[in-house]
């Protein structure tokens, strides 16, 4: 294989590694769930883990239901899902 082909292969493998979400073995499965504000109408600042960006982001939680990917602090989110 030519050096250009090897360079292209290396680039594609690097891109794949960056875009592949962290496996659920590294954190609980609920960390893969999308942010869910729930049906209530409260305005509570909360955090959820975003698996594609591999970081915790803020969202508005309505105060009821939703899902387990919902944390009161960014530190709690990071300890649970981004560690």
UniProtKB/Swiss-Prot annotation:
GO cellular component, one term: extracellular space
UniProt note on tissues of expression: Expressed by the venom gland.
One Pfam family matching this protein: Kunitz_BPTI
Site, as annotated: Reactive bond for trypsin: 41-42
Protein name per the record: Kunitz-type serine protease inhibitor tigerin-1
Disulfide bond sites: 31-81, 40-64, 56-77
UniProt-annotated location(s): Secreted
Family: Belongs to the venom Kunitz-type family.
Residue stretches making up the BPTI/Kunitz inhibitor domain: 31-81
Role: Serine protease inhibitor.
Keywords: Disulfide bond, Protease inhibitor, Secreted, Serine protease inhibitor, Signal
Organism listed in the record: Notechis scutatus scutatus (Mainland tiger snake)
Domain of life of the source: Eukaryota
Signal peptide: 1-24
Record-level Gene Ontology MF annotations: serine-type endopeptidase inhibitor activity
């Amino acid at each position: 294989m030519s050096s250009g082909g090897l360079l292209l292969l290396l680039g594609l493998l690097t891109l794949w590694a960056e875009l592949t979400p962290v496996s659920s073995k590294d954190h609980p499965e609920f960390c893969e769930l999308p942010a869910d504000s729930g049906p209530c109408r409260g305005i509570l600042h909360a955090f959820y883990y975003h698996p594609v960006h591999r970081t915790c982001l803020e969202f508005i939680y309505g105060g009821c239901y939703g899902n387990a990917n919902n944390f009161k602090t960014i530190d709690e989110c990071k300890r649970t899902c981004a560690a």
